[in-house]
Structure formats: structure tokens, C-alpha cells
Amino acid sequence: MEVAMVCTRVNLLILILSLCSPYKFIQSPMDFGPLNLLPTTTTASSDFGRILFHSPSAVLKPQAPRDISLLLSFLSASPLGKVTVAARGAGHSIHGQAQALDGIVVEMSSLPSEIEFYRRGEGDVSYADVGGGIMWIELLEQSLKLGLAPRSWTDYLYLTIGGTLSNAGISGQTFKHGPQISNVLQLEVVTGRGEIVTCSPTKDAELFNAVLGGLGQFGIITRARILLQEAPQKVKWVRAFYDDFATFTKDQELLVSMPVLVDYVEGFIVLNEQSLHSSSIAFPTNVDFNPDFGTKNNPKIYYCIEFAVHDYQNKNINVEQVVEVISRQMSHIASHLYSVEVSYFDFLNRVRMEEMSLRNSGLWEVHHPWLNMFVPSAGISDFRDLLMDSISPDNFEGLILIYPLLRHKWDTNTSVVLPDSGSTDQVMYAVGILRSANPDDGCSHHCLQELLLRHRRLAGAAASGLGAKQYLAHHPTPAGWRRHFGRRWERFADRKARFDPRCILGPGQGIFPRDSSSSNGAFASYS
């Protein structure tokens, strides 16, 4: 065993030296004992955004957290080179955040996929211990067999546990239960130093809080303990249409003020026939809404609130009556409220149907120049105006989500960045501009760059004028990241110095470019 470990260490040192060399030695699969290091793949250099393509020098397919630990321990201790490491989950990033140019990509899906469930376990709560490379859809499928499910979700479930927890993880349940990072009891993390640490709010809390929403900068999540609740059997799914933005947001804020009755709240802008049709694919009932969208020079814009009420099939609660009580307080367009009952699984997995429709049309694997932002409620109307000035409603392809979140459901000890709050502004909005750009429809490289430029200008204006912050942020320079973090930068940088002082992890974010020229460690120029 000791001989094998020595051989592994020697071979890994050879790998590091080859990576630091100006020549490329990794041209064929290599087996370094327990470390399965492979040459780069197309998958490792691409993501859902299809905007950036940065090829690594090698791919690690770990069989256990110890493999990741061994790799990072060597890189952290090595005085040579500037090799970086990125953890890749489902590859759903937009701007190459999980890529590592000339570095090493860790394929998290290679980790063991066991899920352990505990009903009414420690602390009198139910939870699941799940690997960081497992997708949320897998956790849902297994937990439902026990009548349980996580409380907080993302809209799309084919994302990894570790990936969403490294950002925040939001959806229509966030107003009620907080983001996914507020529903974690414990983590197993491999730090940038190569240490395997089990952390929680009461044990190694600084690492626990750093990693949650930490953009992969402090450690790689290899296991998480996710809080569970009783799963409903059915969901009453409701949509209501509006022709006035102020009324739309007023009703959204009304709904999130009723967490006892309402379980999910989102909303979206209806710009044109295409957006109305695509948003209706997963909604399994007839929507008899045929609005006048005006003309190109004088467009008419509509809005849709989507909310849901869980149905536990309890005879003491009539879900139809609950929806009636809620809807009577709303001010939607008369006769344009629609509802349908679906299974809990189908409701949570609703985006999958839209995905399959796009795949069948050849429109899934196209460019996705998305922009996601958190906007203070006081500025949401002004943001809407900025947004409409930056797009053409008649030819916009994609979805624009707008829905409210409640600040007190977020733990500010984590690394996530929220807009600074006023004394009374406890509501903020999640806005997702989820557009597609299809080269086959004429959106060439120039077209894509123009869309990205528009988004940068919109994000910049919203940040400087409204105090908005990017979610799933992309900033091309470290200076841009400093502005993004604002007063939170010092804490973020201190955490980097503590847990990943050589700046090995998360190179695709571009927050801490690794500098091999400093003998005191790569972090010296950022502290």
C-alpha cells in the first residue's frame, strides 16, 4: 500500500511538471494509480452557454473525494507553475465558469452516487446525505419513494447538488424556504489546500459559509446534507395574466406575503407570440389568451404570474377553496386566470418538457447569452424600462423571468452577493433574461457579441443606477469582481487566502487569476 502511494505521488509530480512545461505532454490516457487522469474532452471545454471554449490539459474522474484531495494537495504544495482546477457538474454554466484553460477539470459525476436518507433524524428533521456530483432530479426521484422531498429547488433539475450550492439555487419556492444554500445542514468539502473537511453551521462554520454561494473559490463540495420535508401528492398550478407592470408586481408581492397559503411564486414577461407559446408547452391545459401585441413601433407587453399550492390530499383542506381565496385578492385581467392539477414530480420537472421540445427542434444546443440579476424592489420598475430599451420585443427568443424574493430568507454569512438593502426594502426581485441565439437563424458571431454587449450595458446601468447585482455573475476582470462584491470583498478575499491561497480553484470565474511568479503564493497580489 505504501509503495503504491509513493508511486502515485511520483507520477502526480511528473504530471504537474508536464503541466507547467511549455510543451504538451498529455496526449493519451494515463493511469496514476488511484488517480484516473485523462486527456481533455470536448465536454470539458464547453458548457450550456456555448460562448467560451477553454480547453484543459487533463481531466480527472475521481472515484472518491480522496482523489480530489490528493490532486489539490500536490498542486497546493508545489512551488512550480500555475496549474488550476475546476469542478464540473452538469456543465450548465454560461460563461465558462467550470472551465480551466490548460489546467485540470474534475468531472464530479464520477464520484459515487449513493444517497442516504434519514427520516426525523438528528435535530428531529429529515434529511438526505448526497454526493456533490448527483443531480437534483436523482435526489427527487429517490426521495419521493419515501414520501419526502427537498424544500427549495431550481427550475431546471438536471443540475448537480454541488453546482447549485456553489451559487445559491433559486426558484419559486425561494420566497418561502430561502435558496438551496439556506437548506443545507452539513457539507463535505475538499479545500484548495487539499484538506477534506466536514463542516456545518456549528463546526468549521467559516468554511461552510464560504463555500455556500462561493463560486467554487474555496473548495469542492463532495457531499451535502439536504433538508427534506413531506412531499405533497399533487400541486394546483395557476397562471394569471396582466397588462400593467405595477399591478403585476403588486400581486406578486401580495402572494409572497402569504406563505401559509402559497408554496411557489414566479412570473414572466409575455413579449410576443413565441414567448406565449413556449411558456405554455409545459402547462397542461388550454390557455385561451390571445392578446394584441401591437406593432413593432408600438408594442404591447403582457405579464404572467405563476403560483402553486401544494395538495397533500388532506380532507381538511380544500385546495380549490385555497386558490379561490388567493385569486379573489388579485387584480389580473378579467377571465384570464387558468389552473390545472398535476403531480408534484411533473410540476418540479416542468422545464424538462420545454427542453425536450427545444431539442426536437434543434434549438437546445445553441448560444445562451443569459443574464441573471437581483434587483431591489424599489428599482424594479426602472429596471423594466432599462430592459425594454435594450431588446426588441417582436423578435426576442427566449424567456424573461421576474419574481420576488424575501431578504430574511437569505443567510448573509454565506458568500452570496445580494443588493444592499434600504431600511425598509426587504423584497428584491430575481430577473432572468434567458434568451437563445441560434446561428442557423442568422445570429452569427457578430450578432452574439452584440447581445452580450447589450447585457453588459444593461447590467452596468442596473448596478450603478439601481444597486442591482448579477446572479451567476460574469465579470471579465478582477476589478469588476471587486466592484461586484463591494463592501463584501474583504471578507471574500480573506476566505480565499485561508482556504485556497494558491488560487488553484475556480479559474473560469476570473476572480483570482493565478500568479506563479510570487514565492509567497499566488494570492499575494489580491490580499
UniProtKB/Swiss-Prot annotation:
* Catalysed reactions, as listed in the record: N(6)-dimethylallyladenine + A + H2O = 3-methyl-2-butenal + adenine + AH2
GO MF terms listed in the record are: cytokinin dehydrogenase activity; FAD binding; oxidoreductase activity
Organs and tissues of expression: Expressed in inflorescence meristems. Highly expressed in lamina joints, and mainly in the parenchyma cells and vascular bundles on the abaxial side of the lamina joint. Expressed in roots, stems, leaves and young panicles.
The record's InterPro entries line, in alphabetical order, gives: Cytok_DH_C_sf (IPR016170), Cytokinin_DH_FAD/cytokin-bd (IPR015345), FAD-bd_PCMH (IPR016166), FAD-bd_PCMH-like_sf (IPR036318), FAD-bd_PCMH_sub1 (IPR016167), FAD-bd_PCMH_sub2 (IPR016169), FAD-linked_Oxase-like_C (IPR016164), FAD-linked_Oxidoreductases_BP (IPR050432)
Residues bearing glycans: N413
Alphabetic keyword roster: Endoplasmic reticulum, FAD, Flavoprotein, Glycoprotein, Oxidoreductase, Signal
**Residues annotated to bind FAD:** A87, G89, G91, S93, Q97, D155, T160, S166, I170, I221, Y471, Q509
**Which phenotype arises from disrupting this gene?**
Increased leaf erectness, asymmetric growth and development of lamina joint.
Cofactor(s) this protein cannot do without: FAD
Query: Which EC class does it fall in?
Result: oxidoreductase
On induction, the UniProt comment says: Induced by isopentenyladenine, trans-zeatin and 24-epibrassinolide.
Q: Name one GO cellular component term.
A: endoplasmic reticulum
Q: Key word Nucleotide-binding present in the record? A: no
What range(s) does the FAD-binding PCMH-type domain occupy?
52-231
* Top-level lineage group: Eukaryota
Q: Where is the signal peptide?
A: 1-22
In the record, which positions carry Pros-8alpha-FAD histidine?
Answer: H92
Q: Which PROSITE patterns match?
A: FAD_PCMH
EC number(s) per entry: 1.5.99.12
Chain's role:
Catalyzes the oxidation of cytokinins, a family of N(6)-substituted adenine derivatives, where the substituent is an isopentenyl group. Cytokinins are plant hormones essential for plant growth, development, and stress responses. Exhibits specific activities toward trans-zeatin (tZ) and isopentenyladenine (iP). Plays a role in lamina joint inclination. Regulates cell proliferation and vascular bundle number on the abaxial side of lamina joint.
Q: What else is known?
A: Plants over-expressing CKX3 exhibit decreased leaf erectness.
What name does this protein carry? Cytokinin dehydrogenase 3
